[in-house]
Design a protein with these regions (language model features):
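Acidic, Ser/Thr-rich low-complexity segments on the non-lumenal side of membrane proteins
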Residues: 69-103, 217
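Hydrophobic alpha-helical transmembrane segments of small proteolipidic membrane proteins, enriched
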Residues: 1-84, 116-198
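Cytosol/matrix-facing juxtamembrane amphipathic
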Residues: 194-217
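Short runs of predominantly hydrophobic/aromatic residues within well-ordered alpha helices
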Residues: 32, 36, 88-91, 108-111
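Short, charged cytosolic
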Residues: 2-5, 96-116
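Generic alpha-helical secondary structure signal
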Residues: 89, 105, 109, 158-161, ...
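Amphipathic alpha-helices that form helix-helix packing interfaces
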Residues: 62, 66, 91-94, 98, ...
């Protein structure tokens, strides 16, 4: 009976070893793809930073102008005025939607929907970054632990070359995983701040439009 349990134990250990080591190459490939993606993210962040335009006084002036045009019954021109403000694409699309809603009597309700949709769109854009923050270090840890088994076997057999090769893989995957997580976290924080600022500006635009509408009433 004891021999049977021993055989089952040895078989289970061998299967665990085979399954765990089988994940090494997919893990390395996934890490390299994530690393390339994170570098592309960093480049897109720099490009977005150089192209972002925010002029609060200009936005305020355009919003007040649009409010005056709407009060005069020139809703189409008011929408064109809002669309003329140069800003990030998501905010620009939201301003266009707000401009179109000026032509209806459901402006307040439409604004709430536009704002909610914009918040969801921004959250959706940040989701891959949140995944990258977690996935990078997790894959890095997997890439560290998986080669440790073969490394210990090599050490027990006096195979220094096998030990060294596996340790190199272990340390390299750790570093790459942490770099991926760090880049994703930095991009997440910076873009999150930009998106919150865009939402704040959008709310300010609508408050200006509402204020002029209330004055007219």
């Amino acid at each position: 009976m004891g021999g049977l349990f021993l055989i089952l134990y040895e078989t289970s250990v061998e299967l665990l070893y085979i399954f765990s080591t089988a994940f090494l190459y997919p893990d390395i490939v996934a890490l390299l793809l994530l690393f390339a993606w994170s570098l592309a993210l960093l480049g897109s962040l720099i490009n977005e930073y150089t192209s972002r335009h925010r002029a609060l006084s200009e936005l305020e002036e355009i919003s007040l102008q649009a409010a005056d045009l709407r009060r005069e019954g020139r809703a189409k021109e008011a929408a064109e005025a809002l669309s003329s403000y140069r800003c990030p694409q998501q905010l620009s699309l939201a301003l266009e939607q707000i401009g179109r809603s000026l032509e209806t009597e459901l402006f307040d309700l439409k604004f709430e929907k536009i704002l909610q949709d914009l918040e969801l769109s921004m959250a959706r854009a940040l989701e891959p970054l949140r995944i990258g923050v977690k996935a990078g270090p997790i894959l890095g840890l997997m890439g560290t632990l998986i080669p440790m088994g073969p490394a210990l076997i090599g050490l027990s057999q006096g195979d220094i070359k096998s030990l060294a090769d596996n340790l190199v893989i272990a340390f390299a995957t750790t570093v790459i995983g942490l770099v991926v997580g760090g880049i994703c976290y930095a991009v997440l924080v910076i873009r999150g701040r930009w998106y919150r600022q865009d939402l704040s500006d959008l709310e300010y635009v609508v408050e200006l439009l509402r204020g002029r509408k209330d004055e007219a009433a």
